[in-house]
Amino acid sequence: MTAEQIRLAMENKLEYLMEVKPQLASDDQLYKAAALVLRDLMVEKRRAHRAKTTAERKKRIHYLSMEFLMGKSLKNSLYNLGLVEPFTEALTAFGTTPERLFACEPDPGLGNGGLGRLAACY
């Protein structure tokens, strides 16, 4: 995804989901728009992966745990998707930086056990 595509997708989220003009958006609103754009990308990747594994009749293993301390995910997701540079470039159009958006993200820490943390690594 290019910086221009990211910028347009964020503008769309700001205008149609949050009803705010992009040039008037706060860092918190920009964070939410960026998170929604990333979520959409991850959903597309998950759908493609699921279709492939279903077609190849591969098995899946499910593990559910609410006991984990993964921390904030925006920065990690950008890095894992290889989108740090395009997002950084797109955010300059909004007059902000990734660091300012990272500061807006709440920490979703749940529980404090080692098993959930261990499971999250896999």
Positions of the model-derived regions?
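A conserved ligand/cofactor-binding region detector
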Residues: 1-122
